[in-house]
């Protein structure tokens, strides 16, 4: 398994957390939903449609296109989400028409893109003064003893582990990144708490959907090491009926310079 290859993980993605509808409604208002006619949204790196479904609820009258490069992820999205058209494309080459979108977003996926190519592409597809949002649902570890224990065990089992995400550790200055190419300006940072209560099965399934840990575990110690990590997590939660997982939602919203 390679970092960034989600083919084998698509079947587990339904276990992942969503995003708060209240925040997305607010961001969509900033982008002009409700005041503009023919409002169009591009959910880029849409995966199986976790954010796509939220956008459908927040902007039911909008045209939504979900852009996803991975065939397996896109197939799962088509089955699960009916409010959008799923097409093959990437952050660097969406295949969307120029000046066709009012709002573009990447949910927990912008860190996988080459921002020197993706940001100009987003500016190209957005209408004048269009809005781009990069958003993440980062797990909150400081008040979660089980998660802290799991993370510490994983680090001990994979000593060279390097996380590829925009969680709360080792994260980039995304405001600077988003404005670095000159394609976007006035980048605003928004943050809010969020939580979801998961069954043990879903909690474990969410871990099975995490690409960067699984890829590094397999590369470091083979499939057996990844199986050992899953067994360790399962053992940590064996006495729990369900698990309330806390998140910090981190959103970066910027205006196109077009």
Regions found by a protein language model. Name each.
Residues 107-108:
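Short catalytic micro-motifs in class I SAM-dependent methyltransferases
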Residues 113-121:
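A short, conserved alpha-helix within the catalytic core of class I
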Residues 172-258:
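Conserved Class I S-adenosyl-L-methionine
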Residues 1-34:
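Conserved class I S-adenosyl-L-methionine
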Residues 92-103:
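A short acidic, Gly/Pro-enriched loop at the edge of an enzyme's catalytic core
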